[in-house]
Amino acid sequence: MKGFGLAFGLFSAVGFLLWTPLTGLKTLHLGSCVITANLQAIQKEFSEIRDSVQAEDTNIDIRILRTTESLKDIKSLDRCCFLRHLVRFYLDRVFKVYQTPDHHTLRKISSLANSFLIIKKDLSVCHSHMACHCGEEAMEKYNQILSHFIELELQAAVVKALGELGILLRWMEEML
């Protein structure tokens, strides 16, 4: 009976290891917090709406997230906190508020929001275990993002932030 249990356990472990890459789950290293996220699925959902959302953006001289380079400045220790704030920002101020008559786009945004909810849950666990440090620089950078968002009229800001989601996703990819 022990042999069966050992074989089953070994089979399960190998199955899990083989299955994980197929599902697109990636491990993100955020300082002392480590989470998994299906970045491949999030990228796919975003890529299906990116062009149409970016075409709505008429404020080409203003950036909310700036560039992936500016996000790279976030210290490793502060990444969990910074990402936690950005995930909440996208859930509360972007996905929830975005308006379009296009049902396909709304479905994709709903799917993106669901993926972000999973990330938020995992980041909350890190936060509750005190593994999500919030340094002054990370909070400054997040407040700059909020400031750029608030500069615009609400719907224009939402469109801008949604169109720039790729910047955040590329930054997350770099934490693998």
Curated annotation (Swiss-Prot):
GO function term, MF aspect, one: interleukin-22 receptor binding
Claim: Disulfide bond is one of the keywords in the record: yes
Signal peptide location: 1-24
GO biological process, one term: osteoclast differentiation
Subcellular compartments: Secreted
PROSITE patterns on file: INTERLEUKIN_10 (PS00520)
Transcription as UniProt keyword: no
Pfam families: IL10
Segments traversing the membrane: none
Top-level taxon of origin: Eukaryota
Keywords per UniProt: Cytokine, Disulfide bond, Secreted, Signal
Any one GO cellular component localisation term in the record: extracellular space
PANTHER family attached to this UniProt entry: INTERLEUKIN-19-RELATED, INTERLEUKIN-20
Physiological role: Pro-inflammatory and angiogenic cytokine mainly secreted by monocytes and skin keratinocytes that plays crucial roles in immune responses, regulation of inflammatory responses, hemopoiesis, as well as epidermal cell and keratinocyte differentiation. Enhances tissue remodeling and wound-healing activities and restores the homeostasis of epithelial layers during infection and inflammatory responses to maintain tissue integrity. Affects multiple actin-mediated functions in activated neutrophils leading to inhibition of phagocytosis, granule exocytosis, and migration.
Family per record: Belongs to the IL-10 family.
Binding partners and assembly: Forms a 1:1:1 heterotrimeric complex with its primary high-affinity heterodimeric receptor IL20RA/IL20RB.
Entry protein name: Interleukin-20
Source organism (scientific name): Mus musculus
Gene from which the chain derives: Il20
